[in-house]
Amino acid sequence: MLNTTFDQVMEFPNSCPFKVIGDADDTLADRVVAVAQQLAPGDYVPSVKASSKGSYYSVTIRITVTSKEHIEKAYIDLAAIEGVKRVL
């Protein structure tokens, strides 16, 4: 087992990809971008894909994070978006 900590593995600031999976809703990507803007203002161009049956959308977005706590906040805030099922 490695004796390294999370902070030793990652360098900050870091552009981290987040995949947000939620109900198929045309506003999901806009809501993900709005949360990303609150976390780290910038120009965001998310990638949106529909599931095979069209029931869900996955929105992939890169957010520049500055610490482990910032990553944790991103997961919490993105998961709090209405209709979101998972954040990876």
From Swiss-Prot:
<dbReference type="InterPro" id="IPR007454">
    <property type="entry name" value="UPF0250_YbeD-like"/>
</dbReference>
<dbReference type="Pfam" id="PF04359">
    <property type="entry name" value="DUF493"/>
</dbReference>
<comment type="similarity">
    <text>Belongs to the UPF0250 family.</text>
</comment>
<dbReference type="InterPro" id="IPR027471">
    <property type="entry name" value="YbeD-like_sf"/>
</dbReference>
<dbReference type="GO" id="GO:0005829">
    <property type="term" value="C:cytosol"/>
</dbReference>
<protein>
    <recommendedName>
        <fullName>UPF0250 protein Sfri_0694</fullName>
    </recommendedName>
</protein>
